[in-house]
């Protein structure tokens, strides 16, 4: 199959990535709607605040021209409940002078003739003297609006006084005026009823009114509205929604290693960034358009009087600027959960700088050009300056705003003007390119999810542009105190097969000979991580480097499956990461179909011919399996006409046809692994990496996937890693076992079992009705002939492990055993090699022991005698200090049984009974101090080389 290249591939990748972004946005409807339509709620909020402000000022004439003020007449005494913050029970008024019958009648008339409502008797309190009223005030604060004090001096003279609280209260933005609300109504009522009493006419008309002076509007014609006060802050907050969503989307793909998976498939960086830029640009365009339309819909003069294009461009260019800033920050942020926090910080800084910009800094002739340049690099600053210009152009009722033709003209023709609307737009365009280029630069020099980065001067190196060698590893922090990564010391392999493989590869490399049957040739591959770096006070400190892979030499043939085994931390996944280009190598090289992994051109060719099923599923939860396959097939460069049929075939192969349109987020773990296997097989790759492909699958599905892998061997090489020894035994043509970064053994399954297994495994099954105790003669037969005891026995069968050195005796032994089947009651005899699991544990255990004796990694073995023995991890035969006596001059030892725990680490599963240490065995490891604690109940064990001597 011919894959697309160059511009056609770029176009195909861009289209697929753009469609992916569209689907993700469509399926995350809540976030997308928030991005597009949040402007409506901000505009509505501003409108509501402004209308509320206008409603509270309806009775105010402060901002109006008053030419013919109307008089206020017949003001009633208000209920006491109308007073702000009154205490209940309350009174409409209190009065003094109740010793006078005439005064009492006047007060009764005030209550009865109150305009609009008579005052109930229980809402009025009477006293004799003003002093009594004062005392009552002190004991009943805030329970009355005012007091009247009457004195009848003679038949024609009645004097009165009014007492009110002059303190002005404020409630819900409105201030209470005690003079006009309480004092004036009491004064009118008192004078009216006193006049009627003196005249003797209870119907006497008493008209009294007051009005303000005719005057112009206070403060000129400048209107200070909620829009002009709060609009800039709300517009900045509105822009943060899109900014946070853009930042979170890009960081999520980096955090989940989705971008890394696409890179492995050969995605162009240019197609990746352009797809994000165009899609986010479209969303920004639509959201900016809606903002302006909503502003016009609510009849804000800012949107109506200024040029539509000018207002739209300001919001669009600002939000487009924020896309560039989001891309730049995405290189620094490693967690998508941090996007909201970063968005809030950017808003907070933008809010502060907005206040400073509104105050005039630095866009005036009083400040230098340099300060304006630096200040304008932060998008919210130029946005605030542009908003200020457009707001000032519509701040007064007579202002006509700024038209398109006036965009380059200073407002009012000021000689001190240094910024115009046109310059604002030029700045916004320029700063977008600044942030976008910075984003691309940061993306290359800041460590990615795998800790890989380029040199800070990578763009100056010819190798970056030519793609030829010259590849220097750059990893970890940018801190300059990181030195060069130390080279891996070459260690001659102890295993004869590994040494033979290394010699063969070196000889082929030296001769320049390319074997057409070899798919992958690894030349001394090494990978070292420089360790973590911490910045302290005026210094950098770092931990020791970690050698993950220590000089790997081997060939991987075509049409074969090579299984790479090893415990956790052995270097398997790191090796695959180096071969797929995810991690750069520290030393050595590898040739995949003749292409070097150290060359960017070679790596580009390699990615066209490989497929990768990573250790952990790297999938979009919102995309279906069908959409995943279409996306990766397009990235790979498959012809568009073949993508649908290939995707359908792969779905059939992995049994996902019925779930093809279901989103991957709803899949089980096994279904996700099957989808990852299908993605790895897209485009008929010549080399497939399967990193634990059947993890989480049920047995039936696992068997089906094994069939797929077996069928996929033809015409390609497959590199498999797994923790299932059964899977490795069934699928692999060759097996390599790694431990502690080094290849410990290599060969076919039978070869490894014969070399590293404990020997042959014989299983003897008995006839069902065989009586109890009959197996004893059989046990004696094995003991006498082969010197072995059963490792497992019950009524149904016995299992014996026969050492390799007894191989010459087996033919005659089993011939005699078959002749005596009826004597021993034998139903069946099975003979086989040790399991691959046993081989793996032996190799892993030896590697752990090798490392533990150097690093001092210990575990505690609890013996039945109560002694606790500290032993190195991986030790098999352990001598117990303090058990020496005349009968056992070298003491006692136990055999320790090891297994892997759930995390893949070696742990103790049990131990044998204590046995005598033979005289002829040597010691592998002996601690300097053997006794720990009191009473010799805790000791350090001695590692015995019983295997070699036995």
From Swiss-Prot:
<dbReference type="GO" id="GO:0005524">
    <property type="term" value="F:ATP binding"/>
</dbReference>
<dbReference type="GO" id="GO:0015245">
    <property type="term" value="F:fatty acid transmembrane transporter activity"/>
</dbReference>
<keyword id="KW-0445">Lipid transport</keyword>
<dbReference type="InterPro" id="IPR003439">
    <property type="entry name" value="ABC_transporter-like_ATP-bd"/>
</dbReference>
<dbReference type="GO" id="GO:0048316">
    <property type="term" value="P:seed development"/>
</dbReference>
<feature type="transmembrane region" description="Helical">
    <location>
        <begin position="342"/>
        <end position="362"/>
    </location>
</feature>
<keyword id="KW-0472">Membrane</keyword>
<dbReference type="Pfam" id="PF12698">
    <property type="entry name" value="ABC2_membrane_3"/>
</dbReference>
<comment type="function">
    <text>Mediates the transport of acyl-CoAs and/or free fatty acids to the endoplasmic reticulum. Has no effect on the selectivity of fatty acid incorporation into triacylglycerol or further desaturation steps.</text>
</comment>
<keyword id="KW-0813">Transport</keyword>
<feature type="transmembrane region" description="Helical">
    <location>
        <begin position="308"/>
        <end position="328"/>
    </location>
</feature>
<keyword id="KW-0812">Transmembrane</keyword>
<keyword id="KW-0547">Nucleotide-binding</keyword>
<feature type="transmembrane region" description="Helical">
    <location>
        <begin position="426"/>
        <end position="446"/>
    </location>
</feature>
<feature type="transmembrane region" description="Helical">
    <location>
        <begin position="223"/>
        <end position="243"/>
    </location>
</feature>
<dbReference type="GO" id="GO:0005789">
    <property type="term" value="C:endoplasmic reticulum membrane"/>
</dbReference>
<comment type="similarity">
    <text>Belongs to the ABC transporter superfamily. ABCA family. CPR flippase (TC 3.A.1.211) subfamily.</text>
</comment>
<keyword id="KW-0067">ATP-binding</keyword>
<dbReference type="InterPro" id="IPR056788">
    <property type="entry name" value="ABCA2/9/11_C"/>
</dbReference>
<dbReference type="InterPro" id="IPR017871">
    <property type="entry name" value="ABC_transporter-like_CS"/>
</dbReference>
<dbReference type="Pfam" id="PF00005">
    <property type="entry name" value="ABC_tran"/>
</dbReference>
<feature type="binding site">
    <location>
        <begin position="566"/>
        <end position="573"/>
    </location>
    <ligand>
        <name>ATP</name>
    </ligand>
</feature>
<dbReference type="InterPro" id="IPR013525">
    <property type="entry name" value="ABC2_TM"/>
</dbReference>
<keyword id="KW-0256">Endoplasmic reticulum</keyword>
<feature type="transmembrane region" description="Helical">
    <location>
        <begin position="276"/>
        <end position="296"/>
    </location>
</feature>
<dbReference type="InterPro" id="IPR027417">
    <property type="entry name" value="P-loop_NTPase"/>
</dbReference>
<dbReference type="Pfam" id="PF25158">
    <property type="entry name" value="ABCA11_C"/>
</dbReference>
<dbReference type="GO" id="GO:0005783">
    <property type="term" value="C:endoplasmic reticulum"/>
</dbReference>
<keyword id="KW-1133">Transmembrane helix</keyword>
<feature type="domain" description="ABC transporter">
    <location>
        <begin position="520"/>
        <end position="765"/>
    </location>
</feature>
<dbReference type="InterPro" id="IPR026082">
    <property type="entry name" value="ABCA"/>
</dbReference>
<protein>
    <recommendedName>
        <fullName>ABC transporter A family member 9</fullName>
    </recommendedName>
</protein>
<dbReference type="InterPro" id="IPR003593">
    <property type="entry name" value="AAA+_ATPase"/>
</dbReference>
<dbReference type="GO" id="GO:0140359">
    <property type="term" value="F:ABC-type transporter activity"/>
</dbReference>
<dbReference type="GO" id="GO:0016887">
    <property type="term" value="F:ATP hydrolysis activity"/>
</dbReference>
<feature type="transmembrane region" description="Helical">
    <location>
        <begin position="31"/>
        <end position="51"/>
    </location>
</feature>
């Amino acid at each position: 199959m011919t894959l697309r290249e160059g511009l056609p591939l770029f176009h195909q990748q861009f289209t697929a990535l753009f469609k992916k972004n569209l689907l993700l946005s469509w399926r995350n409807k809540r976030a997308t709607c928030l991005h597009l339509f949040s402007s409506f709620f901000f505009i509505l909020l501003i409108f509501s605040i402004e209308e509320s402000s206008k409603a509270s000022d309806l009775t105010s004439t402060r901002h109006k021209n008053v030419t013919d003020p109307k008089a206020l007449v017949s003001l009633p005494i208000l209920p006491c409940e109308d007073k702000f913050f009154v205490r209940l029970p309350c009174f409409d008024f209190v009065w003094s002078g109740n010793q006078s019958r005439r005064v009492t009648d006047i007060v009764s008339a005030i209550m009865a003739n109150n305009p609009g409502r008579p005052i109930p008797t229980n809402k009025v309190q009477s006293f004799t003297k003003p002093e009594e009223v004062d005392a009552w005030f002190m004991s009943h604060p805030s329970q009355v609006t005012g007091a009247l004090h009457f004195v009848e001096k003679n038949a024609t003279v009645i004097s009165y006084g009014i007492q009110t609280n002059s303190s002005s209260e404020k409630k819900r933005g409105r201030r209470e005026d005690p003079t006009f609300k309480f004092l004036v109504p009491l004064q009118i009522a008192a004078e009216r009823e006193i006049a009627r009493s003196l005249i003797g006419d209870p119907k006497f008309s008493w008209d009294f009114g007051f009005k303000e002076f005719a005057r112009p509007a206070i403060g000129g014609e400048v209107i200070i509205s909620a829009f002009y006060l709060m609009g800039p802050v709300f517009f900045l907050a509105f822009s943060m929604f899109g900014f946070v969503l853009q930042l979170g989307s890009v960081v999520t793909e980096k955090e989940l290693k989705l971008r890394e998976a696409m890179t492995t498939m050969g995605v162009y960086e240019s197609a990746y960034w352009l797809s994000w830029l165009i899609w986010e640009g479209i969303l920004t365009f639509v959201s900016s358009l809606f903002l302006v339309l909503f502003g016009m819909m609510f009849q804000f003069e800012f949107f109506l009087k200024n040029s539509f294009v000018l207002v739209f461009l300001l919001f669009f260019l600002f939000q487009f600027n924020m896309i560039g800033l989001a891309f730049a920050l995405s290189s620094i942020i490693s967690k998508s959960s941090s996007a909201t926090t970063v968005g809030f910080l950017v808003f907070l800084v933008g809010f502060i700088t907005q206040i400073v910009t509104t105050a005039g800094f630095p866009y005036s002739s009083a400040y230098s050009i340099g300060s304006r340049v630096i200040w304008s690099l932060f998008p919210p600053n130029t946005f605030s300056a542009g908003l200020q210009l457009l707001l000032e152009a519509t701040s007064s009722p007579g202002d006509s705003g700024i038209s398109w033709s006036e965009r380059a003209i200073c407002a009012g023709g000021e000689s001190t003007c240094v910024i115009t609307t046109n310059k604002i737009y030029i700045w916004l365009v320029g700063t977008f390119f600044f942030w976008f280029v910075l984003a691309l630069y940061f993306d290359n020099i800041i460590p990615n999810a795998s800790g890989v980065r380029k040199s800070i001067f990578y763009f100056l190196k010819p190798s970056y542009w030519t793609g030829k060698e010259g590849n220097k590893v750059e990893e970890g922090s940018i801190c300059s105190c990181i030195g060069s990564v130390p080279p891996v010391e070459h260690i001659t392999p102890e295993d004869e097969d590994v040494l033979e493989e290394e010699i063969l590869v070196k000889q082929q490399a030296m001769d320049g000979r390319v074997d057409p049957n070899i798919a992958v040739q690894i030349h001394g591959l090494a990978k070292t991580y420089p360790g973590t770096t911490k910045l302290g006070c005026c210094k950098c400190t770092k931990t020791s480097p970690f050698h993950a892979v220590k000089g790997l030499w081997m060939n991987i043939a075509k049409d074969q499956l090579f299984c790479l085994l090893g415990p956790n931390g052995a270097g398997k996944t790191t090796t695959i990461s180096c071969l797929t280009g995810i991690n750069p190598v520290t030393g050595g090289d590898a040739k995949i179909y003749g292409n070097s992994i150290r060359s960017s051109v070679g790596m580009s060719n390699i990615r066209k011919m490989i497929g990768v099923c990573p250790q952990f599923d790297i999938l979009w939860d919102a995309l279906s399996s069908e959409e995943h396959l279409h996306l990766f097939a397009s990235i790979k460069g498959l012809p568009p006409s073949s993508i649908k049929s290939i995707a359908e075939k792969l779905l059939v192969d992995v049994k996902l046809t019925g779930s093809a349109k279901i989103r991957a987020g709803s899949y089980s773990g096994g279904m996700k692994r099957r989808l990852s296997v299908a993605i790895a097989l897209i485009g008929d790759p010549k080399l497939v990496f399967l990193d634990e492909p059947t993890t989480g699958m049920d047995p039936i599905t696992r068997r089906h996937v094994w069939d797929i892998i077996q069928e996929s061997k033809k015409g390609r090489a497959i590199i498999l890693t797994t923790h299932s020894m059964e899977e490795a035994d069934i699928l692999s043509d060759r097996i390599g076992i790694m431990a502690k970064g080094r290849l410990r053994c290599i060969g076919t399954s039978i070869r490894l079992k014969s070399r590293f297994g404990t020997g042959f495994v014989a299983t003897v099954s008995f006839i069902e009705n065989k009586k109890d105790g009959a197996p004893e003669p059989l046990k004696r037969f094995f003991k006498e002939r082969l010197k072995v005891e059963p490792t497992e026995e019950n009524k149904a069968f016995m299992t014996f492990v026969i050492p390799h050195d007894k191989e010459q005796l087996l033919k005659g032994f089993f011939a005699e055993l078959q002749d005596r089947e009826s004597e021993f009651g034998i139903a069946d005899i099975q003979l086989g090699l040790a399991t691959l699991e046993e081989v793996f544990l032996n190799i892993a255990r030896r590697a752990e022991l090798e490392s533990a004796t150097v690093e001092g990694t210990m575990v505690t073995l609890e013996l039945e005698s109560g002694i606790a023995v500290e032993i190195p991890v991986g030790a098999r035969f352990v001598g117990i200090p303090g058990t020496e006596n005349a009968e056992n001059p070298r003491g006692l030892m136990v055999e320790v049984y090891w297994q892997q725990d759930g995390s893949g680490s070696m742990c103790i599963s049990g131990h044998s009974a204590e046995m005598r240490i033979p005289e002829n065995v040597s010691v592998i490891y002996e601690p300097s101090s053997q006794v720990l604690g009191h009473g010799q109940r805790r000791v350090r064990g001695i590692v015995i080389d019983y295997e070699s001597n036995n």
